Amino acid sequence: MRAVTLKATGRVQGVGFRWATKVAADKCGVNGIVRNLMDGSVFIEAEGEDQRVQVFIDVVRQSPTDFGKVKHLEVHEVEPQNYHDFRITN
């Protein structure tokens, strides 16, 4: 089990980024949350099998929506929170 937090900056709010991230998470088979932050970035917690999480990170890095553009993606390893699905929390 691998768990990460991601912080995506760039054109990531107002472009369907959270919805596309949820779709990508469901396709990759990872659980967690995604939410907008007040600074204009997007925060993601994701967990699942190592390979699935890595594929998800790669999708987010390339932007899960054609309307968005990730300029920078911070990735941090964290302890799993045992999410049961993937949700948009705001």
Curated annotation (Swiss-Prot):
<dbReference type="InterPro" id="IPR001792">
    <property type="entry name" value="Acylphosphatase-like_dom"/>
</dbReference>
<comment type="similarity">
    <text>Belongs to the acylphosphatase family.</text>
</comment>
<dbReference type="InterPro" id="IPR036046">
    <property type="entry name" value="Acylphosphatase-like_dom_sf"/>
</dbReference>
<feature type="active site">
    <location>
        <position position="18"/>
    </location>
</feature>
<feature type="domain" description="Acylphosphatase-like">
    <location>
        <begin position="3"/>
        <end position="90"/>
    </location>
</feature>
<dbReference type="Pfam" id="PF00708">
    <property type="entry name" value="Acylphosphatase"/>
</dbReference>
<protein>
    <recommendedName>
        <fullName>Acylphosphatase</fullName>
        <ecNumber>3.6.1.7</ecNumber>
    </recommendedName>
</protein>
<keyword id="KW-0378">Hydrolase</keyword>
<dbReference type="GO" id="GO:0003998">
    <property type="term" value="F:acylphosphatase activity"/>
</dbReference>
<feature type="active site">
    <location>
        <position position="36"/>
    </location>
</feature>
<dbReference type="InterPro" id="IPR020456">
    <property type="entry name" value="Acylphosphatase"/>
</dbReference>
